[in-house]
Amino acid sequence: MSEQNNTEMAFQIQRIYTKDISFEAPKAPQVFQQEWQPEVKLDLDTASSQLADDIYEVVLRVTVTASLGEETAFLCEVQQGGIFTVGGIEGTQLAHCLGAYCPNILFPYARECITSLVSRGTFPQLNLAPVNFDALFMNYLQQQTEGEGEGAAQHQDA
């Protein structure tokens, strides 16, 4: 039996948690008197760190900025964290797991948190579209191979 067959891929979610939350409405209450046709910008960033053998923390930072003209109506940021057991893979497969698969698991939790914060700020409902973290990760890898990538920041306009 080969050594590769003895090493099985292991994946387990140990914990999903909110690491940091921020909501700002710098122009409230004046912003509520304006017609609501905002420009919404969505910024995503992922970071991962190894906590122990085969145990990793992945943090997905989601920042939503809604602007009316030149003024910021609200700024909402959530850092959604997760602790994952990931074993039996390494290299690009491990990077994909930590940079795409785990953020894909964390995103619905961050999206729900942002939706709740925006609602509590009494702004109209905000529905964030699903994010293709696999495509973002592939773009990141392509930038790295071309030497253009600076950091792991990933951005998308909503």
UniProtKB/Swiss-Prot annotation:
<dbReference type="GO" id="GO:0005737">
    <property type="term" value="C:cytoplasm"/>
</dbReference>
<dbReference type="GO" id="GO:0051082">
    <property type="term" value="F:unfolded protein binding"/>
</dbReference>
<comment type="function">
    <text>One of the proteins required for the normal export of preproteins out of the cell cytoplasm. It is a molecular chaperone that binds to a subset of precursor proteins, maintaining them in a translocation-competent state. It also specifically binds to its receptor SecA.</text>
</comment>
<keyword id="KW-0653">Protein transport</keyword>
<keyword id="KW-0143">Chaperone</keyword>
<dbReference type="GO" id="GO:0015031">
    <property type="term" value="P:protein transport"/>
</dbReference>
<dbReference type="InterPro" id="IPR035958">
    <property type="entry name" value="SecB-like_sf"/>
</dbReference>
<dbReference type="Pfam" id="PF02556">
    <property type="entry name" value="SecB"/>
</dbReference>
<dbReference type="GO" id="GO:0006457">
    <property type="term" value="P:protein folding"/>
</dbReference>
<protein>
    <recommendedName>
        <fullName>Protein-export protein SecB</fullName>
    </recommendedName>
</protein>
<dbReference type="GO" id="GO:0051262">
    <property type="term" value="P:protein tetramerization"/>
</dbReference>
<keyword id="KW-0813">Transport</keyword>
<comment type="subunit">
    <text>Homotetramer, a dimer of dimers. One homotetramer interacts with 1 SecA dimer.</text>
</comment>
<keyword id="KW-0811">Translocation</keyword>
<dbReference type="InterPro" id="IPR003708">
    <property type="entry name" value="SecB"/>
</dbReference>
<comment type="similarity">
    <text>Belongs to the SecB family.</text>
</comment>
<keyword id="KW-0963">Cytoplasm</keyword>
